A protein has these predicted regions:
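Extended catalytic core of nucleotide-activated donor transferases of GT-like folds
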Residues: 10-12, 23, 27-31, 37-136, ...
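A nucleotide-sugar donor-handling region in carbohydrate enzymes
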Residues: 161-174, 479-480, 484-487, 494-564
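Nucleotide-sugar-dependent
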Residues: 199, 260-276, 288-297, 625-630, ...
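Conserved catalytic-core segment of nucleotide-activated headgroup transferases in glycan assembly
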Residues: 24, 125, 143-252, 387, ...
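A charged, aromatic-enriched C-terminal amphipathic alpha-helix characteristic of glycosyltransferases
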Residues: 305, 315-354
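Conserved nucleotide-sugar phosphate-binding/catalytic loop shared by glycosyltransferases and other
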Residues: 45-75, 238-241, 365-366, 371-375, ...
């Protein structure tokens, strides 16, 4: 379509999922790029993930390598094919429409509509309505395997199905193991899966049939956890168990002869990615018989009580073992490899089209809503100003701050709204949070930001309620580390209401003993956030001239905070007297924009009100400073000798 960027394929989904769905998408992206297809990636916010997740590392690597472009949901694009992944992503309609004009639309069904007991996993009728409304036309559902297709065939109200199953894709080469026969004198049985009780048999007796408690076997398990001890009790002596992700699955599978996979009766395996990984490695897959429709001659099929005999027979016959391993590897290469994916794309949309980009519609302005707490200083506000200053076009920062220093934001050229904190108003905190919720809901409706960033130590309940009322709004909590040890468990639990948690690194983080240290897996740690870069600082002579400091005297700066929560007057006056009497120093005192009381200074001592003060730090020979995050890192960046006051 004229005026719209064109892509052969647009992939739509929530690509934060840590499991097989995202791995399958990454394989498709790599195969499409290698075949010359141009792919756009449209990230949606699904309802499944309940705590912060980053984009799956393999998908992020694809984006960084240029295998796909990350699309702005507000930008209209045209495509030959939309491939939407996982029904759960379409549980709710978003606040804004997806602007993709596609010729063909598929919804890949990575999760079955029913569990093994016939109970619904999701409302497929509502999801189908939402998917067609969001994607702008007819959507065909593409099961990833025959188990899912069979469930839909039995439904009276099934959505329209694509004619062929959309199998997962794997590049076999990284998984291949040069096998000359079984690894040891004893058969090595293994399995890897995420730590979920549904991925294991229903009871202990069945589990020990498939994974014998018998010293004539070695059993290796990648993906153990408390659930497994609840199932089997103490691990048998012949079991070797590692936590999920303790090692790459490629390395694990190289230590396994037989990949034995039996799961719970409630679980319906839509595809079985771990199975094709095992077969690609040359391990012999031993599976329940319901997998035969998908994997055919690539695996051995047995009931749990038949596993022991099956494994012992193949282990004793080296040639039969190798033949079966080769059958599995050949099936993977033929049916699930990148070439198979490219063949189905060519059958569906033809070869890549030569038109790369449309006429190029201008990118729409997008507003990012920054929310900052009040604080006793202006650190929260300054950190978000540092981020806002670096936002690329067409992003437009908008602020809601509880800080009385709101004028600073406006002086920096940004839109800013001010809402007084409940302590400043003398009102009930519960009523104030209700007001905050309504204010935020109105601001979100008015500015329509795709992202809200909160900087503060404690996410307010009113903020949490506003986020819950806007489930497709992406939310980020920017929080410092260095919490007091043993404190904050109730606060850190609120991270589940954010899509991402960003922690600006503290240069003293080796001494961090606070609770955030134990939540790093859910946190994106970034370099220290500072308002100015090194090149923005004035050279010493220019800074002294700007502040009116005598170039021939020692210059000292005192910045002990706003003084709103601690009275620094006694300390300040003692320091001034000592510096002037003993060292004949030219003393300056930083005056905070939100100070409730004006500074009372002796004659000849100047108040410095410039913002940002860090621009002038090189004017001083010494800084005596409170140990706030911003002050600490700005002084270190400036390279000025300092004494920090706890």
């Amino acid at each position: 379509m004229p005026g719209r960027p064109y892509y052969d394929i647009v992939a739509v989904g929530d690509f934060r999922f840590p499991g097989g769905t995202s791995t399958a998408v990454a394989e498709e992206l790599r195969a499409q790029a290698a075949a010359g297809y141009r792919t756009g990636l449209l990230q949606l916010k699904g309802p499944v993930l309940k705590y912060p997740h980053a984009i799956h590392p393999q998908i992020r690597a694809c984006l960084e390598a240029g295998a796909a472009d990350l699309l702005d949901p507000a930008t209209a694009v045209a495509a030959a094919l939309v491939v939407a992944h996982h029904p759960a992503v379409f549980t709710h309609l978003p606040r804004r429409a997806i602007r993709v004009d596609a010729e063909t639309r598929l919804l890949i069904v990575h999760h079955p509509p029913l569990d093994g007991h016939g109970e619904a996993n999701y409302d497929w009728a509502a999801i189908h309505r939402h998917a067609e409304a969001m994607l702008g036309g007819t959507v065909l559902w593409a099961p990833t395997g025959p188990a899912v297709r069979g469930q839909f065939a039995a439904l009276d109200d099934a959505p329209p199905l694509f004619a062929r199953d959309w199998h997962g894709v794997i590049e076999p080469r990284p998984w291949r193991v040069a096998r000359k026969g079984p690894l040891e004198s004893r058969p090595v049985i293994g399995r890897h899966s995420r730590p979920d009780a549904l991925k294991w048999p229903d009871d202990r007796a069945t589990a020990l049939m498939a994974y014998p408690d018998d010293p004539i076997f070695v059993v290796r398990i990648l993906g153990g956890g408390p659930f497994l001890r609840e199932l089997v009790g103490s691990y048998p002596p012949n079991w070797q168990v590692w936590p999920f992700n303790a090692m790459p699955p490629e390395r694990f599978l190289a230590t396994v002869d037989f990949f034995v996979y039996f799961h719970h009766s409630r679980w319906v395996e839509a595809f079985g990615r771990t199975v094709i990984e095992a077969m690609a490695s040359g391990a012999v897959a031993v599976l329940p018989r319901h997998f035969e429709a998908l994997f055919g001659e690539g695996a051995i099929y047995a009931a749990p009580h038949e596993v022991r005999a099956c494994v012992r027979e193949l282990h004793a016959d080296r040639q039969a073992f190798l033949r079966q391993g080769r059958r599995g590897a050949a099936l993977v290469n033929r049916q699930f490899g990148p070439a198979a994916h490219v063949r189905r794309l060519r059958a569906l949309i033809g070869r890549p089209r030569p038109t790369l980009v449309g006429a190029g519609a201008p990118r729409l302005k997008r507003r990012i809503l920054f929310v900052t707490s009040n604080g006793v200083g202006i650190g929260h506000l300054t950190r978000m100003l540092a981020v806002a200053r670096r936002c690329p076009k067409p992003l437009e920062p908008v602020f809601l701050t509880l800080s009385q220093a709101v004028r600073i934001v406006r002086e920096q050229g940004f839109l800013a709204e001010y809402l007084p904190f409940h302590a400043a108003l003398g009102c009930d905190p519960q009523q104030w949070n209700q007001s905050l919720r309504e204010e935020l809901k109105e601001l979100i409706a008015f500015y329509d930001p795709p992202v809200l960033v909160f900087d503060g130590n404690v996410p307010y309940q009113g903020l949490i309620d506003a986020l819950r009322a806007n489930p497709d709004l992406w939310s980020v909590w920017c929080r410092r580390g260095m919490w007091q040890p043993g404190r904050g468990a109730d606060v850190i639990a609120r991270e589940r209401d954010f899509d991402a948690v960003v922690e600006p690194r503290d240069l003293a983080d080796r001494l961090d003993r606070g609770l955030t240290v134990h939540h790093r897996s859910r946190t994106r740690v970034v370099d220290p956030i500072r308002l100015l870069d090194a090149g923005d600082l004035l050279p010493p002579n220019e800074a002294r001239a700007a502040l009116g400091i005598d170039p021939g005297r020692r210059a000292v700066l005192l910045q002990l905070g706003a003084g709103n929560n601690y009275d620094y007057a006694t300390l300040r006056h003692a320091a001034i007297a000592l510096l002037r009497e003993r060292y004949d120093a030219d003393v300056s005192v930083a005056e905070w924009p939100i100070a409730e009381q004006p500074l009372e200074l002796p004659e000849g001592v100047r108040a410095v009100r410039e913002y940002p003060l860090s621009r002038y730090l090189k004017a001083f020979d010494l800084v005596i400073s409170a140990v706030g995050y911003n002050s600490f890192h700005e002084i270190l960046l400036a390279g000025v000798p300092a004494i920090f006051v706890p």
